[in-house]
C-alpha cells in the first residue's frame, strides 16, 4: 500500500511571490498538488491586507483549487523562535483568534492549521478544536481534530529553520525516497525564502520526483479532510 506525497510552500509574501509562482508552474506540469501555507503577517512589517498583488495571487490560486493552510499570525513575532512552538493555551487562543479573524476579513477560511516551522505546542493543539479547523499539522504528523486520530509522518523541510545546505538537501532526497519505498506518507516542504537559489529548487524537485517514482501518491493535505 502506498502513502501520500504531500508538498507545500511557506513564507509566501511580496518578496517570494514570483518564485513561488514559478515553482508551482513546474510542479503543476508534473501533476504534483502543492499546498500553500499562508499568514496575515510576516516579519512584523509585511501585511497581507496591504499587499494587493499577493492577495490577488492567493485568491487566484484558491479559486483554481489550490489548498491554502493557515500558517500562524506573524511568523517572526518571537524572533528566531517559531511562533506557536512554546505558547500556552491562552496565548495560542489569542493568536489563533487574531489570525482567523484577519484572514476571514480577506476572504480566506482554512480548515487546516500548520504553525510556522511546523512546531506546535501542546497548548496550541489543545485549543485548535475551538476553531473551525478539522486538521492540524506539526513536525511529528497530522492530527484529525474531530476524531482525535493521529497520523505519524515527520516533515522533511528545505529552509523553514531546518537549513538548505547541500548535505541537508541530499539527506532529504534520500529520506523522501526511502520513506516512499516503505509505503509511508512523505511530507516535503520548502520556504519561499529559499526559492531564489536554483540549486535548492532543483534538489527540492528531485526529492519530490524520487518520492513519486518510489510510489508515494501525490495529494494535498485536504485528503485528510475526508477522513473524519
Spans of features found by a protein language model:
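A conserved mid-domain beta-alpha-beta active-site/ligand-binding segment of alpha/beta enzyme cores
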Residues: 149-199
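Alpha-helical scaffolding within the catalytic cores
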Residues: 17-23, 49-61, 138-148, 164-178
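Metal-dependent polysaccharide deacetylase catalytic core of the NodB/CE4 family, i.e.
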Residues: 33, 37-123, 185-192
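Active-site beta->alpha N-cap acidic-glycine motif
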Residues: 1-64, 201
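Acidic-and-aromatic substrate-binding clefts and catalytic sites of carbohydrate-active enzymes
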Residues: 11-19, 39-54, 114-123, 161-169, ...
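C-terminal domain-boundary segment and adjacent tail
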Residues: 1, 34-35, 60, 190-228
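Glycan-processing catalytic domains of CAZymes
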Residues: 8, 19, 69-71, 132-136, ...
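Catalytic domains of cell-wall/extracellular-matrix polysaccharide-remodeling enzymes
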Residues: 87-158, 196-202
Amino acid at each position: 500500500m502506498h502513502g501520500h506525497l504531500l508538498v507545500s510552500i511557506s513564507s509566501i509574501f511580496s518578496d517570494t511571490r514570483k518564485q513561488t509562482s514559478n515553482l508551482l508552474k513546474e510542479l503543476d506540469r508534473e501533476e504534483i498538488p502543492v499546498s500553500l501555507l499562508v499568514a496575515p503577517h510576516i516579519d512584523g512589517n509585511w501585511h497581507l491586507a496591504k499587499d494587493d498583488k499577493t492577495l490577488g495571487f492567493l485568491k487566484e490560486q484558491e479559486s483554481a483549487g489550490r489548498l491554502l493552510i493557515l500558517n500562524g499570525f506573524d511568523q517572526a513575532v518571537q524572533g528566531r523562535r517559531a511562533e506557536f512552538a512554546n505558547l500556552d493555551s491562552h496565548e495560542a487562543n489569542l493568536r489563533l483568534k487574531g489570525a482567523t479573524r484577519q484572514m476571514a476579513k480577506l476572504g480566506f477560511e482554512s480548515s487546516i492549521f500548520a504553525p510556522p516551522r511546523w512546531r506546535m505546542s501542546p497548548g496550541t493543539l489543545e485549543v485548535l478544536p475551538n476553531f473551525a479547523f478539522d486538521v492540524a499539522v506539526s513536525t511529528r504528523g497530522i492530527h484529525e481534530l474531530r476524531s482525535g486520530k493521529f497520523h505519524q509522518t515527520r516533515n522533511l523541510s528545505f529552509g523553514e529553520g531546518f537549513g538548505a545546505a547541500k548535505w541537508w538537501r541530499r539527506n532529504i532526497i534520500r529520506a523522501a525516497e526511502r520513506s516512499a519505498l516503505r509505503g509511508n506518507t512523505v511530507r516535503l516542504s520548502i520556504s519561499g525564502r529559499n526559492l531564489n537559489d536554483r540549486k535548492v529548487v532543483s534538489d527540492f524537485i528531485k526529492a519530490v520526483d524520487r518520492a513519486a517514482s518510489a510510489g508515494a501518491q501525490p495529494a494535498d493535505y485536504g485528503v485528510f479532510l475526508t477522513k473524519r
